[in-house]
């Protein structure tokens, strides 16, 4: 079964890999320069095809990969594919929250030197367990993780962390358009309902909320927005 899963994952990764030319170019460069030789990358991100291509790129640069996913989003065929490629991966689709925390701890126990985080779980763990001195840097994917770094962990993290969600490119490309479109498509597929003429309430008008509202309106939905921040509320009204 794991062989079948790995083959299914390989086909999905191959399809998305062919549509990610920037990472393909980076992977080719990394294969020659090996900038991550001797580094162990600990990751806690969604385990799906695009993430697999990212991990392949890091591995091509010499990194050892130790990874887990996020609760509820892990795709078993991608886990099987990554394991077949020699990476250490913890997690399964049906993991509950307790198992997810065990998986995160397993990544921390591997003593990674670079962290790719979502929600600041890895960063908080290495700081709380006195392991931060072995980490040279990391990234944080989300707004919630960025807020946690700036609030709960403010002044406690001795290594640099780049908050990917602060990038205007991510805000426009992923948050507004990718999230906006995929949320609306998921609504239609899960409910088997169409958007035109229906009333929707979008809670929050940040980049993701703007995208969801934009795609709902484009499909004929009637959209109301709930937003606490005055400028965002005014923007929604316009």
Label for each model-derived stretch:
Residues 1-36, 69-74, 79-198:
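Glycine/serine-rich phosphate-binding loop and adjoining beta1-alpha1 elements at the start
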Residues 43, 52-90, 235:
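Anionic-ligand anchoring segments at beta-strand to alpha-helix junctions in alpha/beta enzyme folds, i.e.
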Residues 43-45, 117-118:
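Short His-Asn-centered micro-motif
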Residues 45-63, 174, 178-238:
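Glycine-rich phosphate/diphosphate-binding loop of Rossmann-like nucleotide-binding domains
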């Amino acid at each position: 079964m794991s062989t079948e899963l790995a083959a299914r994952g390989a086909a999905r990764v191959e399809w998305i890999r062919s549509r990610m030319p920037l990472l393909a170019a980076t992977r080719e460069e990394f294969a020659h320069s090996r900038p991550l030789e001797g580094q162990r990358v600990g990751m806690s991100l969604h385990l799906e095809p695009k993430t697999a291509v990212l991990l392949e790129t890091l591995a091509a640069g010499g990194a050892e990969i130790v990874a887990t996913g996020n609760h509820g989003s892990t795709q078993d065929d991608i886990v099987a594919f990554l394991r077949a490629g020699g990476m250490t991966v913890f997690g399964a689709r049906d993991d509950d929250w307790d198992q997810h925390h065990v998986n995160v701890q397993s990544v921390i126990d591997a003593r990674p030197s670079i962290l790719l985080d979502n929600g600041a779980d890895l960063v908080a763990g290495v700081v709380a367990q006195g392991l931060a001195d072995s980490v040279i840097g990391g990234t944080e994917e989300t707004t919630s993780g960025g807020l946690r770094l700036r609030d709960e962990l403010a002044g406690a993290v001795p290594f640099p962390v780049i908050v990917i969600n602060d990038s205007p490119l991510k805000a426009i490309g992923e948050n507004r358009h990718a999230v906006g479109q995929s949320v609306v498509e998921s609504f239609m597929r899960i409910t088997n309902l169409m958007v035109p003429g229906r009333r929707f309430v979008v809670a929050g008008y940040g980049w993701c909320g703007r995208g969801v509202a934009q795609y709902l309106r484009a499909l004929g939905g009637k959209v109301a927005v709930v937003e606490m921040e005055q400028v965002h509320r005014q923007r929604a009204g316009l």
